[in-house]
Amino acid sequence: MAKITKEQFIESLKEMTIKEVMELVDALKEEFGVDPSAVAVAATPVATEEVKTEVKLTLKAAGQQKVAVIKVVKDLLGLSLMDAKKLVDAAPSVLKEAIKPEEAEEYKAKLVAAGAEVSID
């Protein structure tokens, strides 16, 4: 029997009727003992981690440099000095909710540089 190429095989499939293709599939199952449904289940991609579009920035603690943290909170959130101090003193406290992850990372970097302990949820 002459060996055929993949392209020739595909061209032959294109010329077949649905019934002929079904018969071919059944014959392949029988010949090789393969169950296509088992392969399809195994080929199903694993669920990917959900990407968050909005996060919450929380100040956990002000750290040793409380004054520096108060200044950063004041500048980032546009608060008065007293409001920023109250927010920092009340730690752990939510600084911003429903913000983009990139923005939260930027805020976190500035707060950590000032000595704060921050989390993004």
Swiss-Prot record:
Pfam families: Ribosomal_L12, Ribosomal_L12_N. Keywords: Ribonucleoprotein, Ribosomal protein. InterPro entries: Ribosomal_bL12, Ribosomal_bL12_C, Ribosomal_bL12_C/ClpS-like, Ribosomal_bL12_oligo, Ribosomal_bL12_oligo_N_sf. GO terms for cellular component: cytosolic large ribosomal subunit. It comes from the Bacteria. The keyword Transferase does not apply. GO terms for biological process: translation. GO terms for molecular function: mRNA binding; structural constituent of ribosome. Homodimer. Part of the ribosomal stalk of the 50S ribosomal subunit. Forms a multimeric L10(L12)X complex, where L10 forms an elongated spine to which 2 to 4 L12 dimers bind in a sequential fashion. Binds GTP-bound translation factors. NCBIfam families: L12. Belongs to the bacterial ribosomal protein bL12 family. Forms part of the ribosomal stalk which helps the ribosome interact with GTP-bound translation factors. Is thus essential for accurate translation. This is Large ribosomal subunit protein bL12.
